[in-house]
Amino acid sequence: MMWKTLLCCLLAVSAAALDGWEPGKRYEYHVRGRTLTALHEVANQYSGFRFKGKLVIEPHTPSVLRGQLKDTYHMTVHRMLPDGWDQKFEERESNWERVGMKNKPFEVHVGNEFQFNKLIVTEDTPVWETNMIKGVLSQIQVNLKEVGPDPRDEQEDRLRKIFKVHESSVTGRCEVLYDITPITKFNMLPQPLVEIEEENVNVLQVMKTQNFTDCKKLPSYVHGFYNFHNVFPAQNKAGFMSRSQQTRTIVSRNKETGRFTIRSSVTFHEVVLKPELFNSQQGISVSRMNVTLEEIKSQQHIPPPRPPKDVGDLVYRYSAETGEPSQRDSAYALESNSDSSSSSSSSSSEENAANSRHRSSSSSSSSRSSEEMRDSKKHPRASTTESQPRNSRSRRSLQNSKRSINMYNDSSSSSSSSSSEEYLLPRPHIENAPNIPFMPYFVGNQGSKIGEVDPEKIVLLARTISSELQEPDTMVKKNILSRFSILTNLVRAASFSQLEEATKRLYYRVERADNGDESKLDAWKAYRDSVAQAGTPAALKMVHTWIRKEYIKDEEAAKVVAVIPHAADTPTDNYIAYFFEMVKDPVVHGEKYLNSSAVLAFSKLLRLAAVDSEAVRRYPVHVFGRMVPKNFSARVKEYIEYFANKLKNAVKDKDSHKIQVYTRALGNTGHADIIRHFEPYLVGRESVSTHERVTMVFCLDEFVKTQPSVAQYILLRLFENVGETQEIRVAALYLLMKTDVSAELFQRLAEYTKFDKNHQVVSAVQSAIRSAAKVEGPYKKETAKNAQAAVKILSSKPYDDSYSKSFILNNYRREIDVGYSRLYNQIGSRDSFMPKSVFYKLVNIIDGDRDDQAKFGGAVSSVRDVIDFIRQQFKKDDSQDELENSKYAEDDDIWDLREIANLLEMEEENVDPLEGNVHYDYFGAQRFFTLNKTSFEFREELKKYFKKPQITNINKLYNRMELKVGYPNVMGVPFFFTFKRPTLVKLTAKTFIMPLKPCDHGKPHKFPRIFNVTSDVSFVYSFDMHSHMGVVAPFNKKEYVTGIQRKHMIQIPLNVSVHVNLDKNKVAADFKPYYEDNFKVAEARGIPFTTVHDIKSLVPYVEAEHTSYIRVRPSKAYEGNFGKSVGMVYHYNFETDQQFFDYKWFSSNYFLHYPNVAFYYGWEAQPVFYYDFKLYLDSHNSPAKTVQLKASYDNRYTQPEEEEETRQHSKIRRPRSASRKHRRSRHEERAPLENLEVSDTETQREELYDIVLPAVRAGRLYYASVSVAFKGEENVYSKYEVEGALASSQVNEHISTMLRAHSNDAERKHQYAHVRVNVTMPQVPVIDYRKALEFDPTSKIQCEVHFGDTPEKKSKVYFQGKFERTDERKKFVAESDMAQLCSAQQNNKNYLLPACRNVTEEASKLDKYFFKVKYENLSEKCRNRTYKAYSYLRHYFFPYITENVYPDERKTDSVEVQVQFNEEINAVNVSVKAPILNVEFTDVRVYNKYARALFSLNPRYPLLSQVAKTAFPQYYEPTCVVDYSKVNTFDNRTYEHDMLNDWVEVMFHKPRSKIYKQVSVSAKQAHSKMVLKVLRGDEVKFEMKQPRDSSSSPELKMNDKVIEYERSPAFIHYKHELIAVAYALPSKALHLDLLNDSLVFVYDGERVMLHAGNHYRNQVRGLCGTFDGEPSTDFKAPQNCHVRDVEDLILAYTLVRDLDRSRLRDENICVREDVQLVNLTNHRHAEKSGIRPYDIDDDSSSSSSSSSSSSSSSSSSKSNSTSSSSSESNESALPRGENKLHRAQQPSRNCHMHLHRIVTHNGKQCISKLALTECAPLCREESHTTKTEAFVCFPPGPTADHYTKLVRKGVSPDFSRKTDIVNLRVTIPSRCVSKI
C-alpha cells in the first residue's frame, strides 16, 4: 500500500513538471533586454545598454530542463530618447557587439510548484554570466498550480486566480503576488506580445508583482543608512527611493492535453529616486527583459554541463574572492528567531510585540478579492506599515529590521535553507579588503574586482591631488574632491601589504613646521585621509601601524581614529577585536588626545555594529550576514566591563579627565549594562562630583535610542526624585523627551510645574512641553498632539531665559517631504546669568528620517569660576589679595569684613573643582574634550606667539555623508546608487604677536595691553555633492551612469595685520590679498550628466571621454563687474541653461532660512540644471590693495562744574580706568606698525562731545566709531566712516545723540549723513505708584537729519515726536488687580514689594505717540525708496490697512503719524497722513512680547533695556528690597519681619575670585526709620541715614564725609578713581550707583531697594537670600544650613557681639542641604528590561536587596529597628559624599546607608522624620548607639500605605509640616564593617 502511495506521488510530481514542457521538444525563445538610467524628469538623456540573444530549452527528465543561452549581443545606448526609456530602436546589426559569454549548456531542476530550485552550470562559467542566465530564466518561471485542473473550463471566474507565494528570481527570493486572468486574442491586438496560431488553446495572462519587503533572500549591498530609520533601500519603498518589479507572462493552455506553453514574458524593474535625497525632480533606472517564444522543434539533445557546478536557485550569486571561510557558520546566519542583525541586548517586550504584529500582518489570505489586489497595485505605498502613526517610527523601524533579517529564513524550501551559507560571502580578513558586491570597482571585471590594486596608482593619485591643492583656483575644474573619492575607493580595494607599500612611498615627515615641502606633505595627508575614510580591516591595521611607528600622533592621530566608526564598512567581530587591542596598545594609551579619541571611537563602533538593532541599514548584512555572531553579547559585556573598571580606577584616583572620557565611552555603547555601572555613582554609593554625575546622565543619550522604553523608566525616576540636584533632574528631562512620550506622561510632567519648588526644573518642563507641542510635520504629528494635551496643565508663571530651557524650532516643506529641526537645550546656572550646560543640534529630516548635520554641546561645573579665571588672566590691575586693616573711622556699630564673617560664624562652602567638557562634530567625526582649570589658560597659550611665529597647517579631506546601495536588476547585472559629500578644509597660517607695551614691572604674568598681530592666512573650504546611479556591465568593464555633481569652493587668502590698544579701546586691522595676481574667490558648479565610463579608469566621471552634460536648452553666459566704487573690482562669470533666475525660489530657500540652516540646506528643492558660477578678485583693475578697518570706543562721566575743563581733557575720568601712576604718554602708546597707526580720533570725539554735552550738562558719555578704508600703495581710494556720541543725564532728564556718516568712493562720489537726536524723558517716580500715576511722564523727541552729496545739495528731514500716557491707560492701571494689591501693601507701609514695583512701572508706560516729519529737497530716488518700503508694509498688513487716496486736506512736504495703543498694549492703531494719501492701520495685534516691550516706552528704561528686561524679567536687574515690614529677596521670595532693632546683615558678599571687591550691606531700623551701611572692601564705607526733614533727601556719607547730591549729581572718587555716582530722584529718594561693584541703591530713609549685578549670584548671604535662582534656598544661614522661620534667619544675620546663636547649631532647626537619592531600577524592572543589577562582589554595594519583610510591632527594641530597616534597605535614599554624597570619608563608607526607618507604635505605622544610619547588605554592625528620634505616625489606611510605598521606592518624603510627631528611642549603628 505504501509503495502505491509513493508511486502516485511521483506520477503527480512528474505530471506537474511536464505540464509546462513537452518531452522531446525544443523551445527556442528570442531574448531582448535593456537597462537604462536617466534624470528623466529633467531630460530624456539616457545611458545604458541593450541586450539580445537566444534561449533554448529542452526537457531532459520530468523535473530537469537543459538549456543554452547563445548568440548574445549588446549595444551601448547613450543619447537622447525623446519617447522615453521604452522608445523603439532601429535595428542596425553593425552596432551590436558580442557579449563574451561561454554559451555553455546549463541544467535547471524544477520543483513541485514549477519553481526552479537548482541551476547547474559548467565550472568555467563566470559568475556574471551565471547571473545573466538566472535573469533570463527568471522570465520563464511561472507558478500555475492554482489554475483549475479542467483545461476545457473557460469560465472566467474559475480561470481567474489571485494568490501569493515565495519565489526565487535573480532579484531575490521574495513574496510574489500572482494575478492570473484569461485573455482573448482580441485583447492582445493593441499590444501583440506574441502570435498564437493554435485555435484549441486558452490564453492566460499572468501578472507577477514582487514584494521586496518580504523576502527570504534579498541580494543587496547597503552602507551608511544608519540615521534613516524609514529607509530600507533594497525594498519597495525606501524613503527617497522606490523599487518595483512586475512581470507579465502570456501562457497558452491546450484544451485537449492541458499542457501549458509560455509564449511570452516581459519583466519591468524600475528604481525611482531623488538623486540628492530631497530633489523635486527624480531620476530613474529601468530594466526590461523580454523572452518571446519563436519556435517549438524536435529535441536536439543539449549535452549536460561538464564539469558541473551547482550555483543554487535563481537568486543572484556573489563573487567571493577573499575572506575567512571558516567563519561561515550558523553563528553568523540571520534567522527569524534572532533579535536583530547585530544586537547583543535582550529583546524587550516591545520588540516581541512588534514581531508578532509583523507575523500577523504579513500572512496572506487567498480569499482577498481581486478588486483589493488591483487597488494595492495601484497604490503600492499604502501598506500596513505606512498606515501606522508616524510617532511609532522607532517600533516600525525595528519591525522592518526584523523583516529584513527574516528574509534569509526560507522554511518552505529545503534547498533554499541548505544554500544559505553559499548565498552569503565569506567574511573579510583583517589584512584584506572586503569583496563588496554591486560596486563597480569590485564587480566590473567579469564579475570580480578590477585586478589587484597597484600601489603606484594610489601614490600617483595622491600626488595629483596634492599638486592641484597648491592651486585653489583650479580645484573645482580639476575635480579634486572627485579624485579623493576615487582614491578612497582604491584604498578600499587594497590589501594591507599594498597600503604598506603606498605608505613607504608617500609618508613625509616635517622636521620644522615652517620648512617643508608642502606638496609632499599634502600628498601624505590626502592619502592619510583616504585610509581613514576607507573603513576596511586593512585600513584599520594601517592606521594602527602608523600610530606605532609615530607617523601620526597626538591630535592628528586622534582625528584619524575618530573617523573610523562612521567609515567602517564591515565591522566584524575580528575587526572589533583588533580595534579593541589597538585601544589597549600602550602606544595609543600614552598619546595625548589619541587615547581618549580611540576609546570613544571604539565604543561608538561597538554600539553601531554589536548593540544597535539598526545595523541592517548601515552595514552589508545581506552580503556577509551578521557583523558579529549571535553569542557576541558576552564579548560586548567584556568590553563594557573593561571601560567600567577604567572608570572605577579613575574615580579612585579622582582623575576628572578619565572619569568623563570613560563615562562617555560607556554611554557610547548604548548597552543596558551601563546602567548597573553608572548606578553606584548616580545613587551615591560611590563619590563623584555633581558635574560627573550630570555627565553620566547625559551619556545615556545613546541608551535612549537603543532601548527607549527602559530608558524612559530610569530617567523618569531621576526626574521625579525631588530631592535630586536640579542639574540631574533637568538632564534627565531632556533625555526623557527623546523617548516616545505619551499624552499621559506629558500631563504627568506638566503637573510638576504646579508644585515643584525648583524653578530650573519647572522652567525646563514648561519650555520642553511647549516646544514639543509646536513641532510641525507629519512625522511628529503624534508627539505634538500628545504634548498639546498637557500645555493647558502647565503653570502659567513665566521664567527668565536664564533658567533651564528647551527649544525645538523646525521647518517642514511638504511638497518635497524635507525639513530641518533645531534643538537647543540649556541648564541654568546657580552662580551665573549664563547656562552651565548647552546643547545644540541641527537635524535634517528627509522623508521622516532624521540625520544629524551639526551638533555641539558643552558643560562646566561652574560658569562663574570660568569667567573669573579668564578675567583674572586679562584684567588690567591686580586686586588686593588679602584684606587690609580697616581704614574706617572709629565706630562702635561698624566692624570690618573679617570681623563680620567671624561674628556670623560664616562657613566656607565646599566648592567642586572646575571641570567640564565640550563635544561637537568635527571633520566628519565626533570629538569629545574634557576641561579643567588648565584648559582656560589662554594667556599661556597666547604667549607662545610672542616667542616665535606659530605655524598652522590644517589640510583635511573627509566625507560628511556617504550612502551606498546596490542590488541586481532583472538582467542579472548590478545596479548601484551612491551619494557622497566629500569636503576639503585647508587652512595655513603663520601668526606672530608682538607686545608693544611691556608688562608692568613685577607682573610678568600679565597679558600685554598693547600689541600687534600679524598673520598670513590662506583658507580654502570646498565641498561637493556627488549623486551617481548606474548599472555595471561586467562583460565589457563599463558602467553606465547618470548623476549630478555640485561643486563649491570658497578661498580667502589674506595678509592680516592688527593693532590692539586695550588701554584706549582701539583696534585697527589691515587686510590685504595674499596674491598679487587675480584669484578666484568663490566657485559653484552644478553638472547633471550621463556617461559610459571605463571602470578601470581613474578619471572622474565629469572628465571622462564619453560624458555628456545634461542641458535642457542652450546655455546662456553672463558676466560683469562690481566693486569699482570702492576700489576693489570683482569679476563674475555665470553660465546656465536656465531661462531666467528664479528669485522667488532663491528668497524662499535662503532669505527665509536662519543663516546657520541655510548653510546646510540652501540646496533643498533646488531644480536640477546646469550652472557654472565663478567670482574673481580682479587685482589688475583694482587700484585699492588693502582694506583697513578701524574701531574705537570710549565712555566716561562728566560733571557740570568740569565742563570747561572737559574740553581741555583735564579731569574727565572713565570708570574702570587705570590709576595715574600706571598711565603712559600718548607717544608711548602709539602703534609703530608702518601705515597702521590708529588715527587719533580724539579731536573727532571731542567735537561730538561738544555737540551732545550741552543738552545734558552732566552725566555719562559714550562714543563709538567704525571706519573702512580701501587703500592703494599711497592713496586712499574710498573710505566709509560712521561715528556717534551719546550723552545721558540724571540731572535734566535729557538724552542727546549725534551720528555722522561719511563716504568717499573711488569714483569721487561723496555722501554724508548727519543725524542729531535730543530726547527728553523725565525721571519718573520709582517708589510710590500713586505718585507715578499723578506724575506726567510725557516725553519728547527732536531729530534733525541732513544727507546728500554736498552741503549745498543736501536733503533735510525734521522729526518731532511726543509720547504721552492717556487717561484710559491711567485708569486701566489704577483699577488693575495689581494696583489693588499694591494699595493694600502700601497701607502697611510697604512700597517696594514686587506688586508695587510692577504697577509703578506700568503706571509710567506711554501709549500714545504723535510724530510730525518735515522734509526739504528730498530727491525722487529717496521718495521712491520710501514708497517701496511702504509697499512692503502694505502687503504685510493687508487685512488691517485702509487707504484714502483722496484726502480732504493734503500735506505738503510733511508727514504726520499718530500711534495709539490700547490699554493693555497688545493692539495698536496707526494713522498716517502723507502728501499722496492717508493710511489707517486698525487693530493690529502685537502678539510678540518683545515687540510690545520695544514699542511700549517707559521713560525710566532705554529701548534695549526694555527688551532685555522682557527676556530676563527677574535677573536683568536683580532686585532685593528691605521694606518697612517685609523683605523681597533677589530670587523673589517675600517674607515678613519685625523691626530690625539691631544691625542685620542684608547682603554679605565673599567672592571666590580676587578680581572682585568684597561687599557688605547692613541695615538697622529705629523709630520707623532705616539706617544703611555699605562696606566696599576694607577701605570704603558708605552710610545712608534718614533725611533731616520731609523736604530733604536722605543723608549720604562716605568714610564719614558728607556727600552733597541733591542739587546736582555727586561723582565720588577714591584714590583718583571714580567709584560711585549719587543723585536725588523726584521723590527725594537717594539713588547711589557703585560703578565698579555693579550695585545700585534706592533709599528713602524707610526702605531700600538694591540692584546687584549677576556676578553676585550664589556668592551672597543675608536677608536678601542666596541669589542662586531658587527661592527655596533663601533662608540659608551663614553656617550653610537652612532655617524655616524668619526669626531664626534674622538671628543668624544679626550683628551683635556675644549673641547666643546656639539654637542654630540644632540640626532640626538649621537643616543641612542634602541630596536624597533613589535607586534607578528594582529587581522586577531589571529582570524585565534585561539590566543586570550592580554586583556587590564588584567592590560596591548591591542595587537592590531581596529582603522586604515588614517590621514587627515592637516600638523601640533593637531587633524591631533592625528588621524594619532591612526591609527597606534596597530602595531607600542614600547619603552624599565629598560633594554632598558622603558626610565623611570613612574606611567602611560603603557599608553605611541612610534610610527612613519604619516601625509600628501603638497600632500606628511610624516613619522616621529623617533618614537614619543603617548597615548596608553584606555588612555587619560593629557598634551602635541609642538615640531618641522623631517619627511621623499614621493610622492604618491609604495615607500610611502611600508613605510606606514612597519610602520603599527610595523617595525621601517631606515631613516638615507634619504635626503628629512621636519621639521614639531606637538603636542606630555607629560603625559598620564588611562581612566579606
UniProtKB/Swiss-Prot annotation:
Glycans are attached at residues 211, 290, 409, 595, 631, 932, 1012, 1055, 1318, 1398, 1417, 1424, 1469, 1532, 1636, 1719, 1760, 1770. One of its GO terms (cellular component) is extracellular region. Its main location: secreted. InterPro entries: Lipid_transp_b-sht_shell, Lipovitellin_superhlx_dom, Vitellinogen_b-sht_N, Vitellinogen_open_b-sht, Vitellogenin/Apolipophorin, Vitellogenin_N, VWF_type-D. Residues 1518-1703 form the VWFD domain. It holds the Pfam family Vit_open_b-sht. SMART domains: DUF1943 (SM01169), LPD_N (SM00638), VWD (SM00216). Residues 1-16 form the signal peptide. GO terms for molecular function: lipid transporter activity; nutrient reservoir activity. Disulfide bonds join C1520-C1664. Residues 322-424, 1192-1239, 1729-1788 are annotated as: Disordered. Residues 330-368, 387-404, 411-420, 1741-1772 have a biased composition (Low complexity). Keywords: Disulfide bond, Glycoprotein, Secreted, Signal, Storage protein. The keyword Transcription does not apply. The gene is VG2. This is Vitellogenin-2. The keyword Glycoprotein applies. Residues 1209-1225 have a biased composition (Basic residues). Precursor of the egg-yolk proteins that are sources of nutrients during embryonic development. Residues 21-838 form the Vitellogenin domain. It comes from Periplaneta americana (American cockroach). It is found in: Secreted.
